[in-house]
Amino acid sequence: MAAAATATAGTKGVIRQVIGPVLDVEFPAGKLPKILNALRIEGKNPSGQDVAITAEVQQLLGDHRVRAVSMSSTDGLVRGMEALDTGAAISVPVGEATLGRIFNVLGEPVDEQGPVTTDATAPIHRPSPKLTELETKPTVFETGIKVIDLLAPYRQGGKVGLFGGAGVGKTVLIQELINNIAKEHGGVSVFGGVGERTREGNDLYEEFKESGVINSDDLSKSKVALCFGQMNEPPGARMRVGLSALTMAEHFRDVNKQDVLLFIDNIFRFVQAGSEVSALLGRMPSAVGYQPTLGTDVGALQERITSTLEGSITSIQAVYVPADDLTDPAPATTFAHLDATTVLARALAAKGIYPAVDPLDSTSTMLQPSVVGDEHYRTARSVQATLQRYKELQDIIAILGLDELSEDDRRTVDRARKIEKFLSQPFFVAEIFTGMSGKYVKLEETIAGFNMIMSGELDHLPEQAFYLVGNIDEVKAKAEKMASEAKG
């Protein structure tokens, strides 16, 4: 639903001041636009340069003036130009027509694929769902990825922080999650690129096309909509593009009643843009120079990401930690909203263990017996204890060798190595690179497999049989094949 226009819609004001991306606009007495209304400035400036800018009202200054933040470059704006009050908030297209397309903060397509064929639009500002509309029973969101489902399960309608440096497999993990939710849950995904590199957005788009997540021949069969506000754009666009992506996701949840994945890369840039806008508006900075409204800004976005009785939005958010300081107000405020953290480790990627999810550093509030059940909880904790013991023994092994360990410790090391290998699995979206067919592993199969390793049932199988397979039956089949090849 498009936002209802207010009584001031169509009122024209005059630009009185331009400071970077911030404009002061004077309106007739009694005709001031509401805060968060979109202003539209179109036409030619005195030099004959075409100007088409949308700005969002942020402050009412007095003397019939408002202060607005532009969503694009203010090059060419001059004092005296007219600004039209649209009478409503910025609205973006929603629904199936957005799938396979790339949008900017204003919902305009930027992929050179022509206009979007839909009349359905929705305002980017709306209240979070009422308490009575929320699904309060915690439900595990099965991803089909063993290491996540067992050790750091995602909550349906929850928020997950994704931590990882360059080249450890963040994008591939994101693609696999998009693929799995489409195939197994019949859901769709929305990707919000907030203040990251344009090159990365382009690479992601090309990789989505290559892996089939975006179907170039028939866009309606695509599984993802993309919304970008990149590093080179003004802070207004970077501050609002996360809300544009979220609005598209909310439509799939509330109207189509689907389970939706919302990716935000990077949530820190959203806070950073808010800080820039806050300074431009003349607000007194808070701790470490952040905006005084930091908690409110983050909360307004995060509280809309939730499970309702109709459907769910599960959010995966890449979190940049400035100077690796977890006490910095930006990541610290974000952490308060997260249900799970998935940490990607370079050391695992170097060993060829993909996905390179760190089984000891990744956490989830869902991993408790009352939510996942006793068997899942016991298996997960037992696996983590074995891996932790292996980590402690590595120094001894490096200095003295395996032979100096006790019988029990040798058994622990053997099982830990099998667990480490079994936590890897081939991905559907990586088939073209690995030549191996992707695997979706049900949670029950994952738990059963790790229980068999921990019980010692599979102690006789070679370590390599556990590498890049799906469930435990594939391990046994691979071990038999290896044995027959060794004989032959």
Swiss-Prot record:
This is ATP synthase subunit beta. It catalyses: ATP + H2O + 4 H(+)(in) = ADP + phosphate + 5 H(+)(out). NCBIfam families: atpD (TIGR01039). Its EC number is 7.1.2.2. Pfam families: ATP-synt_ab, ATP-synt_ab_N, ATP-synt_VA_C. Produces ATP from ADP in the presence of a proton gradient across the membrane. The catalytic sites are hosted primarily by the beta subunits. One of its GO terms (molecular function) is ATP hydrolysis activity. ATP binds at G164, G165, A166, G167, V168, G169, K170, T171.
